[in-house]
Amino acid sequence: MAEQTEAPTTEESVLVITRVFDAPRELVWKAWTDPESVMRWWGPKGYTSPACQIDLRVGGKYLWCMRSPEGQEYWSTGVYREIVEPERIVCTNSFADADGNPVPASHYGIPEDFPGETLSTLTLEEREGKTELTLRTEDLPAGEAHESANAGWNEAFDKLADHLSQA
């Protein structure tokens, strides 16, 4: 099971979540970089992930989909800016359509103050056979967008912990 080691940072426009997973770093890396693995955990509780494309190289893109229990699909895309295997990924994040074209958050009924693009840095550090994951998302306004992203990521990380325990 994953444990949250720090409260999320509430600094204006930055969300930082740190979790420790009972799995080796290489396995956590694979969970983020292998499409079949991503589809096993991506999305909040109750959501599934029916599609995932990853072009894991600097300048490459990803296109991930999560589906709500009601059947609504939410697509996200981004560009990889930095990759240091198995330690760090820096990428942009945007809502998208099924073809990978960025769309505003309002396309999915999300308040318009949600930014068109954020920047995320994923860091994985080994800790005595476990992995400390830190996700830092920049350009995310304080308030509802910040709280919603925090809740969604933490639910996804709970699912990631379950996936890693079965891997």
What label would you give each PLM region?
Residues M1-T48:
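Hydrophobic ligand-binding cavity/cleft-lining segments
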Residues E12-T18, R25, K61, W75, ...:
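Intrinsic-disorder/low-complexity, polar/charged segments enriched in Ser/Thr/Lys/Arg/Asp/Glu/Gln
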Residues V16, E36-V79:
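Short beta-edge strand/loop motif at the mouth of beta-sheet-based domains
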Residues R19, A51-C52, S76-E82, E117-E125:
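Hydrophobic/aromatic beta-strand elements that line small-molecule binding cavities or substrate pockets
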Residues R25-E26, L56-R57, R81-I89, T123-E132:
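A short, structured loop/turn motif at beta-sheet edges
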Residues V28, V38, Y62, Y80, ...:
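Hydrophobic pocket/interface hotspot
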Residues V90-S94, G100-N154:
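Beta-strand/loop substructures that line and gate deep hydrophobic ligand-binding cavities in soluble
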Residues F157-S165:
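Short amphipathic alpha-helical signal-transduction/dimerization elements
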